[in-house]
């Protein structure tokens, strides 16, 4: 298992930039390095607002939309979850399912799971339980269509 200190600085910055603003206090008190990085990241966060998929107790975090942004595929799909958009949402989800393999992020209560694309062939998943000061981070080394990890 990789430690946060073993990851490249760019990847750590990318992961920490995806942490919700409400959770930044916990990040800053975790260690001195994270504190320094989070201060640097928070300055640029306004420009990055919304570039994540966050799930918390069956509700979608911030602005109640899903944003799929994978630069090397040039895909950007925004789905509004209001009642008037249910049909459009179903169509968009069909399009997403046909383009991507399903990835289930199962979270309980107010836990948060964040999916990030990093570089051209890496994905990072950050899991943060509601209670406690623990973050789990999984990073792929290469994205393969037939590769499955548990």
From Swiss-Prot:
SMART domains: FBOX (SM00256). It comes from the Eukaryota. It holds the Pfam family F-box. CDD domains: F-box_AtFBW1-like. Residues 1-47 form the F-box domain. This is Putative F-box protein At2g33655. It comes from Arabidopsis thaliana. The lineage of its organism: Eukaryota, Viridiplantae, Streptophyta, Embryophyta, Tracheophyta.
């Amino acid at each position: 298992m990789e430690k946060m200190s073993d990851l490249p600085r760019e990847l750590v910055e990318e992961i920490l930039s995806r942490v919700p603003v409400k959770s930044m206090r916990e990040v800053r008190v975790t260690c001195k390095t994270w504190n320094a990085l989070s201060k640097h990241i928070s300055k640029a966060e306004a420009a990055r607002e919304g570039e994540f998929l966050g799930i918390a107790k069956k509700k979608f975090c911030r602005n109640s939309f899903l944003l799929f942004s994978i630069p090397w595929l040039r895909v950007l799909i925004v789905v509004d979850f209001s009642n008037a958009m249910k049909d459009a949402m179903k169509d968009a989800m069909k399009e997403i399912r046909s383009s991507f393999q399903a990835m289930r992020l199962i979270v309980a209560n107010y836990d948060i799971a964040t999916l990030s694309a990093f570089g051209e062939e890496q994905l990072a998943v950050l899991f943060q339980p509601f209670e406690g000061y623990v973050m789990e981070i999984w990073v792929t080394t290469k994205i393969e269509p037939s590769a499955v990890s548990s």
